[in-house]
A protein has these predicted regions:
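Amphipathic alpha-helical "coupling" segments that flank catalytic cores
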Residues: 1-201
Length: 201
């Protein structure tokens, strides 16, 4: 059962961070977690999800392939973003010491490739609650995190040469999921291609 795999992988997700191997070689986080899980008799599905939580690790890296790995990766990255923002450590200019932009793009690429029609807002809110963010600070923090994510999505669409006005129109709707935005962009681009073909003919 996918839920059972996810719950178990979540329980074991960070256990390898306490080991000497990962303390010495931080780039092995997740890699060693997977190996330790297998050695301890965990299922291959649980072990793979533990590894996949860190994917993608860099631009062009592979994305998580398992359902549990995708969910764990999204949850982990959202938690990192919310925790860092809650401490006032918001990336500015070229400064991004915690690689929050990369993590956000990773989240978006997972969603774009999975076509999951989900909203990130409940995950952000749950993360704020688990981090004990004061209630009177949550609305502001939610707005900051959502704006940060939206800007990354805008950049992804710009790289695909989606017109500015189309992106602004789509992303002005805060209730629109990443999958919804992607579907509308594809439809609009397909329509634009049809128009160009007609003009050529």
């Amino acid at each position: 059962d996918a839920r059972v795999v996810l719950e178990r992988a979540t329980e074991l997700a960070k256990t390898d961070l306490t080991t000497g191997m990962v303390t010495e070689f931080t780039e092995l986080q997740g890699v060693m977690g997977k190996e330790y899980a297998l050695l301890d008799g965990e299922s291959p599905e649980v072990a793979e999800a533990i590894f996949e939580q860190y994917l993608p690790r860099f631009a062009g890296d592979v994305l998580p392939q398992t359902e549990a790995g995708k969910v764990l990766s999204i949850i982990d990255k959202i938690d990192n973003i919310v925790a860092t923002f809650s401490r006032g450590l918001i990336p500015t200019g070229s400064q991004d010491p915690y690689a929050l932009r990369r993590q956000t793009i990773g989240i978006l690429n997972i969603l774009l490739n999975s076509e999951w029609n989900i909203s990130l807002r409940p995950i952000i809110v749950e993360s704020m609650n688990l981090l004990n963010v004061p209630a009177d600070k949550q609305d502001e923090l939610l707005g900051q995190v959502e704006e940060f994510i939206t800007l990354r999505l805008k950049n992804i669409f710009l790289d695909r040469e989606v017109p500015h006005h189309v992106i602004d129109l789509l992303l002005s709707n805060n209730e629109l999921s990443v999958a919804d935005a992607e579907g509308l962009v594809k439809a609009l681009l397909a329509n634009r291609i049809d128009e160009n073909v007609e003009l050529v003919q």
